[in-house]
């Protein structure tokens, strides 16, 4: 068997794509290796969202090149940097053998065989008419998922936010059929999966078909919830413009849908939201939060924030701070704005000095971290169901997730007893990024 090394960067969709890549290449005579030195093929599944993504890729390729000089090594660049950079990758790294975009990964077995045979560089960054989901048997991308599994229900984005590369690297919105998604969920359930995460670049824009009728995400969630052995359902990432009534209702009706939503707002300033082309206002976002709370009062919120967007004034930034104070997030991801080549905002004037970006980021993160700790501390003394999915770094430690997406650590004499199980845990302590707890004495083993 030859060695296959895959490194995945960025979002959950890339993790999902890497699983597909692994399972369609293994039949060529490969097995997964964890060390570059053991690899015969290296695949870098890249992300293009953040600053200097391409430079990080070339730096990584430089390290891999040193290994290639000592052995016959096929190097593949996949993912969104591959889509964005295209043949520029061959120019800057002529030792790369294959460049393949995220919508063409299903062609990788053919590309690998061909590249090794003809000894020439090959590129495929098309947006094919036949999607990767239609080209690959569903059984091939459900393998190797353990406790919690991803199902891609939607890809691409039609929103064209002025800072974002996704519409250019992932293409327009595409939704899989209900039948295909449900079949995948059934296979995962039969393999012992307890939690399913429905993923998409703009997942709540889902509009798949079932027997000729269009379904939205709320209806899809309630359909998947009928699978008895699936105990938790989560979806990410959402856009405020695509929140809809049946999704609100699903949060109120479907107990398997966890009380947590990641709903990026990016800014609390309407001026900046317009410049970002977000197509919603801060007030509309707040109303979405209020509507969700009417349907389920204990729901927790996560968001993304960009500070230092071109033209952002102190007042604009303070509007973001006020929004955070009003919503009270349990988690948030925040970043300094960085121009992405090819996006409209990269050409905007009034770029913000990095020093100011850093100051604003620090202030925002201090507030978010304070809210996160306060949210976690409210759990102390309460008992919550925790899904345990991996061992901790210490002996007898096991790590799980609460329904609010908090990591929870417990110590037990037999961690294996609780793996892939949902167990009531009494929370004894809280930190910014995790909880600790104990198994109540009344719980039968």
Curated annotation (Swiss-Prot):
Which residues does the record give as [4Fe-4S] cluster 1 binding sites?
Answer: 11, 47, 80
| Record EC number | 2.8.4.3
Q: Which reaction does it catalyse?
A: N(6)-dimethylallyladenosine(37) in tRNA + (sulfur carrier)-SH + AH2 + 2 S-adenosyl-L-methionine = 2-methylsulfanyl-N(6)-dimethylallyladenosine(37) in tRNA + (sulfur carrier)-H + 5'-deoxyadenosine + L-methionine + A + S-adenosyl-L-homocysteine + 2 H(+)
Question: What broad class describes the main subcellular location of this protein?
Answer: cytoplasm
Gene Ontology cellular-component terms listed: cytosol
A Pfam match: TRAM
According to its UniProt entry, the function of this protein is described as: Catalyzes the methylthiolation of N6-(dimethylallyl)adenosine (i(6)A), leading to the formation of 2-methylthio-N6-(dimethylallyl)adenosine (ms(2)i(6)A) at position 37 in tRNAs that read codons beginning with uridine.
Put simply, this protein is called tRNA-2-methylthio-N(6)-dimethylallyladenosine synthase
Name of encoding gene: miaB
């Amino acid at each position: 068997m030859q060695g296959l090394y895959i490194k995945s960067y960025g979002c959950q969709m890339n993790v999902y794509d890497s699983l597909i890549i692994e399972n369609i290449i293994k039949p060529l005579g490969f097995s997964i290796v964890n060390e570059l030195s053991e690899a015969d093929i290296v695949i870098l599944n890249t992300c293009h969202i953040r600053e200097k993504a391409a430079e990080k890729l070339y730096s990584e390729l430089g390290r891999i090149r040193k290994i290639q000089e000592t052995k016959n090594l096929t190097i593949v660049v996949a993912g969104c940097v591959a889509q964005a950079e295209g043949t520029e990758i061959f120019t800057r790294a002529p030792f790369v053998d294959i460049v393949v975009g995220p919508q063409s990964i299903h062609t990788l077995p053919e590309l690998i065989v061909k590249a090794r045979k003809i000894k020439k560089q090959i590129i495929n960054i098309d947006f094919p008419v036949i999607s990767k989901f239609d080209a690959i048997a569903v059984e091939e991308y459900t393998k190797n998922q353990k406790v919690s599994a991803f199902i891609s229900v939607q890809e691409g984005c039609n929103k064209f936010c002025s800072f974002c590369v996704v519409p250019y690297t992932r293409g327009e919105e595409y939704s899989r059929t209900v039948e295909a998604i449900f079949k995948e969920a059934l296979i995962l359930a039969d393999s012992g999966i307890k939690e399913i995460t429905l993923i998409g670049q703009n997942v709540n824009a889902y509009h798949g078909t079932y027997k000729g009728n269009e379904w939205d995400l709320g209806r899809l969630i309630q359909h998947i919830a009928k699978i008895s052995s699936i105990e938790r359902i989560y979806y990410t990432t959402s856009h405020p413009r695509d929140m809809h009534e049946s999704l609100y209702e699903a949060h109120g009706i479907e107990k398997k849908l966890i009380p947590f939503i990641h709903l990026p707002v990016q800014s609390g300033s309407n001026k900046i939201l317009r410049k970002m082309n977000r197509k919603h206002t801060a007030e509309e976002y707040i109303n979405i939060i209020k509507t969700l709370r009417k349907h389920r009062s204990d729901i927790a919120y996560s968001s993304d924030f960009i500070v230092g967007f071109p033209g952002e004034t102190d007042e604009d930034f303070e509007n973001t701070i006020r929004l955070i104070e009003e919503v009270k997030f349990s988690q948030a991801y925040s970043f300094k704005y960085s121009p992405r080549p090819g996006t409209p905002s990269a050409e905007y004037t009034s770029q913000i000095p990095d020093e100011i970006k850093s100051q604003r980021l620090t202030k925002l993160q201090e507030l978010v971290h304070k809210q996160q700790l306060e949210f976690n501390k409210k759990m102390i003394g309460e008992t919550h169901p925790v899904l345990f999915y991996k061992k901790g770094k210490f002996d007898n430690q096991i790590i799980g997730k609460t329904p609010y997406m908090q990591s929870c650590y417990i110590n037990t004499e037999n961690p294996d007893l609780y793996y892939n199980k949902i167990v009531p845990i009494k929370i004894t302590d809280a930190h910014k990024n995790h909880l600790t707890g104990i198994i109540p004495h009344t719980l039968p083993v």
